[in-house]
Amino acid sequence: MSKALLRFVRLSPTKARLIARQIQGMNVELAIASLEFTPNKAGRVLSKVVASAVANGSLDAKSALIVSCRVDAGPVIRRSIPRAKGRATAIRKPTSHVFVEVAEGKEMKSSKSHKKNQAEGK
């Protein structure tokens, strides 16, 4: 099992979580192919992090699976923009921390469903 972490990426966590949920549990090769054609910034960022996780564990992309893909909120960068009558309003620029965990296909059993089955005695 190998991991990759990208911190402080200038990306909205709510928008990135939509894409992260789609690729969780997918084959790595299929996930990277689908992320390259996703028409937003989160697709490009997640594609690079998944590729990095595969390279970190020196795994084969054809047989590896994405065990978990998590996007956490990072610090919010605040900027001000001038407005009428001498006022200024705040602009929020959110950042994210992207965490991807990749494993060989047979290790996918270590998910929540496997733990639940063990608790039930199956």
From Swiss-Prot:
One of its GO terms (biological process) is translation. PROSITE patterns: RIBOSOMAL_L22. Residues 103-122 are annotated as: Disordered. One of its GO terms (molecular function) is rRNA binding. Keywords: Ribonucleoprotein, Ribosomal protein, RNA-binding, rRNA-binding. One of its GO terms (cellular component) is cytosolic large ribosomal subunit. NCBIfam families: rplV_bact (TIGR01044). Belongs to the universal ribosomal protein uL22 family. PANTHER family: CHLOROPLAST 50S RIBOSOMAL PROTEIN L22-RELATED (PTHR13501), LARGE RIBOSOMAL SUBUNIT PROTEIN UL22M (PTHR13501:SF8). Part of the 50S ribosomal subunit. This protein binds specifically to 23S rRNA; its binding is stimulated by other ribosomal proteins, e.g. L4, L17, and L20. It is important during the early stages of 50S assembly. It makes multiple contacts with different domains of the 23S rRNA in the assembled 50S subunit and ribosome. This is Large ribosomal subunit protein uL22.
